[in-house]
Structure formats: C-alpha cells, structure tokens
C-alpha cells in the first residue's frame, strides 16, 4: 500500500511540475510577443462620401506577428468591423479607443461616425476569413471584405 501511495504522490508531483512549466512557457511566449514592434495596418469603415465599403477590403496578416489594426470611420454612419472566425483565431492584447483600453476576447468593433480604434493582436490560426459590417443592410450593399492569415 505504501508503494501505491508513493507512486500516487510522485505522479501528482510530476503533474504539478508540468502545469507550472506550461504556465512559465506561456508567460515567456506572451512576453516575447509583447516585445515585437506592432506592424501598423489601417482600414477605413466607409468614407467621407458615405459609401458602404471597407478600404482596403482585403487584409493580409502573418501568423505569429504582432499587429496594430487602426480602424477609422470617416463616414456619417456607424459601422461594425465584424469577423468572428478571424477574431476566434487571434490573441488580442488590447483594443484602444479614446482614453479606454479593453482587454480580452473581441469579436466585433463598432465605430460611430468619426471614431478611431486601435486593435493590437497576434494571429494564431491561418486561413481565409469573411469581414463584414453587421449594420442592417450594409453587408447586402457590399460592405464586405476578406482577411487572410498565412504561416
């Protein structure tokens, strides 16, 4: 019985050691990502003529690189930057808008007329993702785009 107890304690110790190693590794990786300079990419949601489009409507990112996606809305209407599948495949460091900084998972960003927001993230999963404005009628009017993440 003592042998089984010792094996159990040893297994529990090894499991705890494994978890602490993974936490340290995750902290190191996160720290390394934060040291990368963010690559600046800008997208306009609409334009001064109130056309329903993203400019540019095609975005390309490389997995593992840190980006600052600057979203601006020069139009007189609110717009959404909606790309849920893309957002599920990235690590978001933060979104900054005005004097507010938001941390955690982001799936959609709403920009009111004249607004600007900076979304700092690292793509993790390669693929092609649909971008759209989810304001009623905007997707149907052509306010769509594509996001590509390569390895």
Task: Outline where the language-model segments fall.
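Short aromatic-acidic-glycine turn motif
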Residues: 87-98
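Short beta-strand and strand-turn-strand segments in soluble, beta-rich domains
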Residues: 51, 96-104
């Amino acid at each position: 019985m003592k042998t089984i107890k010792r094996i159990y304690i040893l297994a529990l110790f090894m499991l705890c050691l494994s978890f602490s190693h993974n936490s340290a590794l995750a902290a190191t990786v996160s720290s390394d990502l934060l040291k990368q300079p963010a690559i600046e990419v800008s997208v306009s949601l609409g334009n001064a003529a109130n056309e329903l489009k993203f400019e540019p409507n095609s975005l390309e990112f490389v997995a593992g690189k840190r980006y600052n996606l600057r979203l601006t809305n020069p139009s007189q209407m609110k717009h959404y930057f909606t790309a849920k599948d893309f957002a599920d495949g990235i690590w978001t460091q933060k979104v900054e808008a005005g004097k507010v900084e938001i941390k955690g998972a982001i799936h959609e960003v709403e920009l009111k007329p004249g607004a600007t927001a900076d979304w700092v993230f690292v793509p993790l999963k390669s693929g092609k993702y649909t971008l759209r404005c989810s304001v009623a009628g905007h997707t149907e009017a052509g306010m769509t785009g594509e996001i590509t993440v390569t390895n």
